[in-house]
Amino acid sequence: MTAHLPQEISSRCSTTNIMEPHSRRQQDGEEKMPLQAEDIRPEIKDDLYDPSYQDEEGPPPKLEYVWRNIIFMALLHVGALYGITLVPSCKVYTWLLGVFYNVVAGLGITAGAHRLWSHRTYKARLPLRIFLIMANTMAFQNDVYEWARDHRAHHKFSETHADPHNSRRGFFFSHVGWLLVRKHPAVKEKGKNLDMSDLKAEKLVMFQRRYYKLAVTLMFIILPTLVPWYLWGETFQHSLCVSNFLRYAVLLNFTWLVNSAAHLYGYRPYDRGIGARENPFVSMASLGEGFHNYHHTFPYDYSVSEYRWHINFTTFFIDCMAALGLAYDRKKVSKAVVLARIKRTGDGSHKSS
């Protein structure tokens, strides 16, 4: 059953307030609730949860290991561990570069691939889109198109075999294991049927996809390795192991915590029937992505949180871009909707309960 929501548009702050609640199923024996697909983003619907999909019965398929990825991740983390031993002897500019690079790259994931392109929770003008596509390339976590396709599948088929990093398969699988094995057949089957027409029509996203390997070589490998070496005389060993291996391993693991820890540990104040949790530690590590129970309850909210800037650097960044006129039409769930949802499906942990 669908419902068209009245929208309250504020031209002053360029924010769309969602005025009616959104319902979804309850799990673990609780009553299932009808889904209402709000017509607030006409260009995208395939990130809304589909309660009709259920896993097929029977034994899971045999795991097929991707040894290339296993070897790469093993070598990366060995290099990162060695990089930790080099941190005390590296120049201060080197680790400052690593922090700066990861914040920018992180925004390419959180403000770019996630909130802009996966969920269309706000709109960005060309200069901001160019910045975010470059920042996303710096992160080296798949191109925007592939990242968004996997993420939409994660929301639509959450915690089923069609979810690429299904948390029901355990912490390790949802953290990194899903990258070390072939995708479950259900992920492939459902993923190819997702509507990705909005991204296929965006020239910048498809340009990145076409030249992704070349761009990653330049922006992810060459720049962070050679800049410390050439500009302030860092040793090549320190540049490679600290500014590249260690930096990248930290960025990856902080991102992966959203898939693992934020689906297994924390409170569920907005929807007790789903696995996604509120995890402040994950929010600190991931620039604000740890308010996961809220995000899976209201995936169309640009802040992915009820509290906007609280432990949420990405929302602060988007709001700054809006103040500069580079971001607009930010979707925000109204307080009345949030409180109604807390009362109806929350676990009682919210301060208003």
Swiss-Prot record:
Cytoplasmic compartment spans: 1-66, 113-211, 258-353
Q: What keywords are annotated for this sequence in UniProt?
A: Endoplasmic reticulum, Fatty acid biosynthesis, Fatty acid metabolism, Iron, Lipid biosynthesis, Lipid metabolism, Membrane, Metal-binding, Microsome, Oxidoreductase, Transmembrane, Transmembrane helix
Localization recorded for this chain is: Endoplasmic reticulum membrane; Microsome membrane
Q: What is its main location?
A: endoplasmic reticulum
What cofactor(s) does the depicted protein rely on?
A: Fe(2+)
Keyword Iron assigned: yes
Chain intervals for the UniProt region annotation (Disordered): 1-42
What induces or represses expression of this protein, per its UniProt record?
A: Up-regulated by agonists that activate NR1H3. Up-regulated by a fat-free high-carbohydrate diet. Not down-regulated by a high-carbohydrate diet supplemented with unsaturated fatty acids. Down-regulated by leptin.
Tissue distribution: Detected in heart, but not in brain, liver, skin or adipose tissue.
- Where is the sequence biased in composition, kind Polar residues? 8-18
What is the topology of this protein in the membrane according to its UniProt annotation?
A: Multi-pass membrane protein
Residue ranges for motif Histidine box-3? 292-296
Free-text comment about domains: The histidine box domains are involved in binding the catalytic metal ions.
One GO biological process term: fatty acid biosynthetic process
Task: List the EC numbers from the record.
Answer: 1.14.19.1
Q: Does the keyword Iron apply?
A: yes
Motif (Histidine box-1) positions are 114-119
Q: Tell me what this protein is called.
A: Stearoyl-CoA desaturase 4
Q: Which GO terms describe its molecular function?
A: metal ion binding; palmitoyl-CoA 9-desaturase activity; stearoyl-CoA 9-desaturase activity
Q: How is the cofactor bound?
A: Expected to bind 2 Fe(2+) ions per subunit.
What function does the entry list?
Stearoyl-CoA desaturase that utilizes O(2) and electrons from reduced cytochrome b5 to introduce the first double bond into saturated fatty acyl-CoA substrates. Catalyzes the insertion of a cis double bond at the delta-9 position into fatty acyl-CoA substrates including palmitoyl-CoA and stearoyl-CoA. Required for the biosynthesis of membrane phospholipids, cholesterol esters and triglycerides.
Positions binding substrate in this chain are 69, 142, 149-150, 182-183, 256
Point to the regions of Basic and acidic residues compositional bias. Answer: 21-42
For the ligand (Fe cation 2), the binding residues are 154, 263, 292, 296
Q: Which residues form a coiled coil?
A: none
